[in-house]
A protein has these predicted regions:
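Structured catalytic-domain cores with a bias toward divalent-metal coordination
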Residues: 2-272
């Protein structure tokens, strides 16, 4: 996610993977063939027994919502994941694809996955949709057809135990995450950071995106009511879950490293 410029983090943990130095004023790294990725996602989901629902269509694109039922329904935790809301953040849909292909989901969890919320943005290699709207600022008074359709789908779903939103940050010095946990439930943040640091540097800056950070974790102290332009996470924390995480891979690193980081974080969160 784009934000204010930050000083280079001199305390960043040593890691063999280094920044590429391509991102100047925006994302200038590898891109994806989003149509091919979406086809692969649909194929992998069908192979692993997921059900698929199309909740929006535009041009030749379909917005898929995937669902996997738990082995046992009694007291099964419900988990929601999303990716690809910004068209210049390709690691998210690729991570969703790999998670589907590897199929390491907990068998007694109910999983809801929306793997690509802005496919047209990927064809343009830009953050916004075709109309220039940042979808991740459009979840309060929605103007875009994409956000309205997604919210309508979310309204039909049950409450989730927690959510994971997969993102990238073109300025980041390493992986970091946001935690929304207003009821102070057991945190998953530290275990995700511990898993990710094995495959990707962690951004240890004391200030990230203008907010205090500790060990790659941001715990915002403001409430959604204070902000007029809601990201998806604000809608989720107010309407669908009481605990959630926005995962930020550093997009000035090699694409495989970023995918590895997101996959490691998700697998750590689901290890219960």
């Amino acid at each position: 996610m784009r934000g204010r410029k930050r000083r280079r983090n001199d305390s960043q943990r040593f890691h063999r993977v280094q920044k590429l130095g391509k991102n100047h004023g925006g994302y200038h790294g590898e891109t994806i063939d989003v149509r091919a990725v979406q086809r692969a996602i649909a194929t992998a989901a069908q192979k692993q027994g997921w059900t698929a629902e199309v909740f929006h269509t535009q041009a030749d694109f379909k917005w898929l919502a995937l669902h996997r039922a738990p082995r046992h329904t009694a007291n099964a935790p419900r988990l929601y994941l999303s990716a690809g809301i910004h068209g210049d953040e390709p690691a998210g849909p690729l991570a969703a694809l790999r998670l589907l292909q590897e199929n390491r989901w907990p068998v007694d969890a109910e999983i809801f996955l929306v793997p690509c919320l802005n496919p047209i943005g990927f064809t343009l290699n830009r953050r916004e949709n075709a109309g220039g709207i940042d979808l991740n600022r459009d979840y309060r008074d929605s103007k875009s057809a994409e956000a309205r359709a997604h919210i309508a789908w979310l309204e039909r779903q049950p409450k989730f135990d927690f959510y994971l939103c997969l993102h990238e940050d073109w300025e980041a010095h390493g992986f970091y995450l946001y935690e929304q946990n207003p009821d102070h439930q057991p945190s998953l943040a530290e275990k995700m950071i511990s898993a990710v640091e094995k495959v990707c540097p962690i951004d240890l800056s004391e200030n990230i995106e203008g907010r205090p950070a500790h060990g790659g974790i941001i715990r915002p102290n403001h409430t959604p009511a204070e902000r007029p332009d809601w990201p998806e996470a604000f809608y989720l924390i107010t309407q669908k879950a009481r605990r959630g995480y926005t995962l930020e891979a550093p997009s000035d690193f090699p694409l495989p490293t970023r995918v590895n980081a997101l996959v490691a974080a998700v697998n750590a969160a689901l290890d219960f």
